Amino acid sequence: MSQIQTRTEPMVINMGPHHPSMHGVLRLIVTLDGEDVIDCEPVIGYLHRGMEKIAENRTNTMFVPYVSRWDYAAGMFNEAVTVNAPEQLADIAVPKRASYIRVIMLELNRIANHLLWLGPFLADVGAQTPFFYIFREREMIYDLWEAATGYRMVNNNYFRIGGVAADLPYGWVDKCEDFCDYFLPKVDEYERLITNNPIFRRRIMGLGVISREEAINWGLSGPMLRASGVKWDLRKVDHYECYDDFDWEVHWEKDGDCLARYLVRIREMRESVNIIRQAIKGLPGGPYENLEAKRMAEGPKSEWNDFDYQFLGKKIPPTFKIPKGEHYVRIESGKGEIGIYIIGDNNIFPWRFKIRAADFVNLQIFPHILQGAKVADLVAILGSIDIIMGSVDR
């Protein structure tokens, strides 16, 4: 009896840009052979707003409120790297207290970023309950931000060249400690609900595997890189801010699949609480911003009416000129390495302001790891990458 031969042709389908699982306005042109994915072409740019060109027509002080719109789930990281670039280019010192406050804010943002990743990712694979839990904890972080900066989710506009915009208000430190005490048991609750759930583990284990060599060759960073067996964290590597003052570990996994990326992020939330507690305990006194506006055109010291004087101002002036030179600054955001390549030419505007977004680079490997996967696994693999289209498109 002869076997019946069936011949199928590849089918091309569009996912997005208006799709609840695309995590923004991302369009995927997916080529399928039955249930198997043959090819996938991401189409980006729907949220492009010309952020780099805007930066080149604004002073650094004027541009800080804009940057929260890149990765609108991690505005503090955007602000930090934006002010770090001219600080390092112009050799501006940041007071110790301001550096500690920055670390506290950055680690709160890392927790908020991972929470906002966790809820939709679990909803993508069919677990709805934790989706509502994560917003409960994020609201507490937003309350802390509102008390310190006046705003909740984006546009905190808190970081300044040489420090931060305002000191922590009375009682804020106690509220932050209360949040840390409250949040750690909640992470244990997530683990009980999710990590040890056999249905969840079977659903994502072995999906979207990225080897150590692939992760390095594709330029991945953040949890995507650490989940593939590379123990690389810019907080340890570049020694920026005051992370060297604290005792903390870099968490990593070897399997490189969706489950490994989940485990890295869960453990990073615990580690962020550990860093915040140490920063609060050792929070020094002193100014919260650099009180010497010593990078004005006159230089560090000038003569005026035959007197030597040191110009003291409350803040770095809005007309602060970026010295001639070029510099690349990077920090470890919740998604990976976010960097700024800045070129100054003794003007108040940067000559070039290049943004290196972590999720834009991490998204490049998506078609590669999707080949041969089932179409039902597409959304789970995409969710494990953690992208925000405002940051991808800029």
Curated annotation (Swiss-Prot):
Main localisation: membrane
Membrane topology: Peripheral membrane protein
Annotated localization: Cellular thylakoid membrane
Keyword Lipoprotein carried by entry: no
Tree of life domain: Bacteria
A biological process term (GO) from this entry: photosynthesis, light reaction
EC number: 7.1.1.-
Assembly description: NDH-1 can be composed of about 15 different subunits; different subcomplexes with different compositions have been identified which probably have different functions.
Database matches in NCBIfam families: NuoD, PRK06075.1, PRK07415.1
Protein name, UniProt field: NAD(P)H-quinone oxidoreductase subunit H
Source organism of the structure: Trichodesmium erythraeum (strain IMS101)
Gene that produces this protein: ndhH
